[in-house]
Each structure stands twice: as C-alpha cells, then as structure tokens.
A protein has these predicted regions:
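Short glycine-rich loop/turn motifs that provide flexible caps or phosphate-binding loops at active sites
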Residues: 8, 18, 39
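Short, surface-exposed ligand-recognition loops at beta-strand->loop->(often short) alpha-helix junctions
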Residues: 15-24
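An amphipathic, aromatic/His-enriched active-site/gating alpha helix that lines ligand/cofactor pockets
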Residues: 30-42, 61-95
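Short, well-ordered beta-strand segments in beta-rich or mixed alpha/beta enzyme
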Residues: 8-15, 45-72
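Glycine-rich beta-strand-turn "strand-cap" elements at beta-sheet edges
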Residues: 1-8, 46-54, 82-105
C-alpha cells in the first residue's frame, strides 16, 4: 500500500460512562456494517484502553480528505453517533493526523 501525503489519519478518544465500556464497544460495532462498504476507508479499528476499560480508541485511516469527509457525513453516521449517547461518559475527542511512514502502509 503506497502512502500519499493526502492520506488522512484520525484517532478518536471515546470515554464511556463508568462501567459502560463494554456496552459502548458493543454498540460501536454497528459502524462496521457501513465502514466495510466505504472504498476510501483503509483502516477503522476499535480498541479498548489497556488500563481503563471505560475508554475506547478508534484508529481511522482514509485515502484522502474526501474519503474522511464522506465517512463523517454519511447518512448513517449521525444516527449512529446518537445511538452511542446512552453509553458515553463525555464528549469524544478527535485528533487528525497526517501519516508519514510505517509498517503496513
């Protein structure tokens, strides 16, 4: 896989309400039905924090800004976000990145 400077990386930090991390993770899995159909989405990986079961991280990698925008403005995205609300313990934080180099890219 060739890496271009137009590639967009994103790390999302999702704090779950106390004791709701596993429920948030389960609810989040609904995204994969849609993400698996997105041609410009290279990686979309859900993680649980190794030291805090109520903190989830999502690593996302897109072909370009257009693919990232298409993902975040997709028809399914807003209702999906609302479906996570009962399990959230705070606002998600998003960190946009420009990948430089790495194994697997």
């Amino acid at each position: 896989m060739r890496l271009k400077m137009s590639t967009v990386g994103l790390i999302a930090k999702l704090p779950a309400a106390e004791g709701k991390g596993s429920e948030l993770a389960e609810a989040f899995k609904a995204a994969f039905e849609h993400v698996n159909k997105e041609s410009g989405t290279r990686y979309y990986i859900l993680h649980v924090d190794a030291s805090n079961a109520d903190l989830l991280w999502v690593y996302e990698l897109y072909e370009n800004q257009e693919a990232a925008t298409a993902h975040m403005t997709a028809e399914w995205f807003a209702p999906f976000g609302k479906s996570l609300a009962p399990f959230m313990g705070g606002r998600p934080e998003m960190f946009f990145l420009t990948p430089i180099q790495g194994k697997g890219l």
